[in-house]
Amino acid sequence: MALTISRAQYVATYGPTVGDKVRLGDTNLWATIEQDLLTKGDECKFGGGKSVRDGMAQSGTATRDNPNVLDFVITNVMIIDAKLGIIKADIGIRDGRIVGIGQAGNPDTMDNVTPNMIIGASTEVHNGAHLIATAGGIDTHIHFICPQQAQHAIESGVTTLIGGGTGPADGTHATTCTPGAWYMERMFQAAEALPVNVGFFGKGNCSTLDPLREQIEAGALGLKIHEDWGATPAVIDSALKVADEMDIQVAIHTDTLNESGFLEDTMKAIDGRVIHTFHTEGAGGGHAPDIIKAAMYSNVLPASTNPTRPFTKNTIDEHLDMLMVCHHLDKRVPEDVAFADSRIRPETIAAEDILHDMGVFSIMSSDSQAMGRIGEVVIRTWQTADKMKMQRGELGNEGNDNFRIKRYIAKYTINPAIAHGIAEHIGSLEVGKIADIVLWKPMFFGVKPEVVIKKGFISYAKMGDPNASIPTPQPVFYRPMYGAQGLATAQTAVFFVSQAAEKADIREKFGLHKETIAVKGCRNVGKKDLVHNDVTPNITVDAERYEVRVDGELITCEPVDSVPLGQRYFLF
């Protein structure tokens, strides 16, 4: 017999459904559920008097020998994903990967159970009815200055770190390069203890090929070209030749001082080959004043770093001091001051906001401890989205913010994965991918996750006093969970490496325990492949006034005095 309940009762019990709108944190962004994959009346819910019990939503006969039985299920959860959209479903996990997005349960007693989403006695259950699930974030601009960065990253919802470095050496303070085979081996061994997925860039600044090849063979998933080592046309050409040969990505921080050429010379050296440009606006470095024009090319995968996101009243002042420290400049030296001033331009920073909203800039990253904050990639992304809604209005005519939300979440999930040849494994919650999942209460969305799941195992979470009688008493703060303890760390995170390194079996050679996964398809991608962020308009920059125009139209916006997801969330 059917039971009719009010919509309010349904939402209170099972969470929102199709047409319901959910506010993201204290932003002005509202996500509307587009599709509900659950069967009404057969929702799975765990707890006293609920449905996930033997003979009801849990099978009384299915063992784990049955490949359709789940290890872990998140029930009734709202999903925000660049590829799946904004939907309601159960998420089924087995062997550390997502095996189903649909209806979990017991097919002996329930209709429409997704075939490979059986709940059995071997299945752990987490109620997601009033939570939002997103894919773990990917930060592709990491200066590996200190290992404690990984903790701050995962606590913010970022589960994959790609970059370079060797610790607090001056070369690492300024550039994201792990130079040479010896350091590559040491850094892989050190990263065994980190609870996140990791990939390292080799130093791409070399005008001959063999010194680049040996770094890739030692495990580098890509090469980083940085102006502090000399971003010359010869260096660019050499790095891209090796990249094409060995199927890895090249990231570049171009020549701010225009010492060896201008933007046009760099683009000529790139010669149509795919490349990932860092802080493409230019405050973080790059051809002054017009590196932002690189975003219009179809072979350029343009990224931002988070210190310029979004444009606020404090952005300019903060950058000048950061720049002096990170690039070893001296305020007493006029040339150093001029160098700093050339990089910090309000006009191009304002344009960067709008280019993100238009889908011209495709990727968000941090520039960790080197002019950026590793724990603020997610926050700054949504602050930018909110600012653009307030200043530019709605995108499209859907009557909701879904398209803008999908555009912005793609910038730190699927698009960096596509850029670096790892989208087969991470970057979205699609079936088959590693179960790196972040769960948020809507009121804390983008700021403070409830639970971070790595490869199907809870790795970090908000946790109260361990001596309390229940899990919630204060002090509540992030603590590593069992997925980030002992030998489990090696089973819940992976290393991304080159195909050459995988063939050479560096896992065995270096004595590593984490799985190594080779990057693939780095050279046949382009801007057209970046989800919701594939726009390639004509961009011009006035060399004297720094004004930015897109297809002839001036683009600019005002800095704001305050942002959402800010101080009110960090009183304690």
From Swiss-Prot:
The gene is ureC. Its cofactor is Ni cation. PANTHER family: UREASE (PTHR43440:SF1). Keywords: Cytoplasm, Hydrolase, Metal-binding, Nickel. The modification N6-carboxylysine is found at residue 224. Pfam families: Amidohydro_1 (PF01979), Urease_alpha (PF00449). Residues 136-572 form the Urease domain. Carboxylation allows a single lysine to coordinate two nickel ions. This is Urease subunit alpha. Gene3D superfamilies: Metal-dependent hydrolases, Urease, subunit C, domain 1. The lineage of its organism: Bacteria, Pseudomonadati, Pseudomonadota, Gammaproteobacteria, Pasteurellales. CDD domains: Urease_alpha (cd00375). One of its GO terms (molecular function) is urease activity.
